[in-house]
Amino acid sequence: GEIEQARQTYNVVGNMNEYQVTIGETTFGGRPELADSTGIIDYGSLIYIGLQRSRTAREAIKIMTDLVQQYGYYSEGESFTIADPNEIWIMEMIGKGPGIRGAVWVAVRVPDDCISAHANQSRIHQFDMNDKENCMYSPDVVSFAREKGYFNGVNKDFSFSLAYAPLDFGARRFCEARVWSYFNKFTDNGKDYLPYIEGKTNTPMPLFVKPKHKLSVQDVKDMMRDHYEGTPLDISNDFGAGPYK
């Protein structure tokens, strides 16, 4: 497909532009019936067009959501980390089904003193619809879920994740577990969230947590190499390790 080009674009190298707007992603899939093969914009194009046209994270969110509304969203459910030198946001988005242009989405700002993560599973549950400074969402994010039969409660109880990407045990053990290991490494609350990862409770982990100390670039790089070492999920000590240790 084709879209109209902007009058001005910005330099982009990798996943960052000249204003230090940075966008990362993980795919969570979500309800398969919401995929739309007729949309023009896939998540990768959405990232790079957003970077070409935005000077702040907030501006990137508006540009990205306007694009899918105008041209349609081709990909499955997606989690985006959208950052600039002053703010970090987590945005989650999923289509509306075959032939329906647009998407439902929500974006939540991560507090300056907190850390967050996503690992191929939708992580935004309840969000404050009245906090316009720290939360943005599509106007029909709740009403569309009601229309499809995914949710029938009151607005304050609405969970984007449960409505559009219901968890199963595999999602917890293979996706949410990676977020748990990150939180476990840098907070004292890891033991509180482990029962959720093990499927013993349905209380999800928070979207963000306050770490014990400010993280360095090296801290983040190290966690990208994490294999649950020294935790109950250590893969060298379970059946997945096979005969190797």
Regions found by a protein language model. Name each.
Residues G1-D42, I63-T203, L207-K210:
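A contiguous strand-loop segment
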Residues E33-S37, S45-S54:
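Second-shell loop/turn segments in exported
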Residues Y48, T65, V142, K221-R225:
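Generic detector of well-ordered alpha-helical segments enriched in charged/polar residues
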